[in-house]
Amino acid sequence: MPSSIEFRSYSEHDDYLAEGKPEPSIRSQTLIYHSGNSKWWIKVTFKGELHGLEQRTPKRERRREFQNFVKHIDYSSLPLLDDTVTEVLLEELSEPHHAALTLRETEELASSPFASLARTLAYTMREDPSRVVYPSCREFQSFPQINMAELSDEVMITAGVFKVFNVQNKAPYILKVVNRPLYYPYDTEVIRRELEVLEICKGVPNIVQAAGIAVSTNPYMTSSASDQPLVVFGILLQFHSGGSLKEALSEGRLLDHPWERWAAQIATALAHLHGAGITHMDIKSSNVVLDSDGNTILIDISGIGGVTYEWCAPEIRDEISPIALPFEVRRLCDVWAYGRLLSEIVSRAEDSPVSRRLRQIADCLTEENTRSRMTLLEAISQLEDVGIGTLCGTCN
């Protein structure tokens, strides 16, 4: 059976733009090499510049030229790695070398801008460090497994997050995939951590619950045999039909819901995380959704997925890596962000004894001085009294 290649993504380092150079110094083409009943994922990376290039060419032209070159590489001569992505690093060497590329000689190659470099290129190989890493299902055996083939009708909610349906029972889920746009290897650790936190928070009210893990065979699998081990393609979460709290607030639908109980629901959910030694670090209205009864559900609970600057407490806004701060500092940030969220909710409410009380609590939670900032447990205690007419005490 003849071999073939299937082009996938092309990328370039764009530092050359700031440096005023006519071309990138690093460019990569990912492809799938098919031979017989096997396939290998390969990323060919060229480090260097074409000789004599003075004017900048369009990116699509550079991609076409590089693709024309890499399709002439004899991949059968390379020691490709199975079940992963092999990166073939190409660099020009001025001295003779042993790791020379084997190329198919054609007129097309002879006319390629890479022709003058072809015989001076040395290659090294490694497992691509930027490949998408899919966790093994064996890491998360406590979660129900649903094969991707059983899911359909993907509707994108945001980057890497979809609403899907089970083809058998039509149950809706939220699917968070591992291979999100602009993927970095750290994204896999975020997925792993979220699954760990979901296990810890199983059955806890007002915290998103896992429906299972979406599984598939390893996309990088070399063999076409059917009995391949499964990997985690993504997280399946329970779907809630009420939309996000951010949408409810921006669309003026606050009074359509039992909004007075939201403050206590979010606070107790956050307190449960803190009690388990977990911080959220991205409390905001878009990370709270509403169920069919108008109750709040806290989502994105990995605690390491990133922060939103304007929702960070003042004392950590200049930190390069807020996620790496000590637990107590992160906990105080969560408390401040919760106070800001409470303030945002109250700002959409009509004036009443309850809204005035909640506004006072929000002010205490967002104190810039961390020593005088109200604690979450103090806020919960105050919230238990909302509606009975007692005013919130002053911050101290």
Predicted feature locations:
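Conserved structural core of kinase catalytic domains
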Residues: 209-256
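ATP-binding glycine-rich loop module of kinase domains
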Residues: 134, 144-200, 205-208
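Regulatory extensions appended to serine/threonine kinase catalytic cores
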Residues: 392-396
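Catalytic-loop of the protein kinase fold
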Residues: 270-291
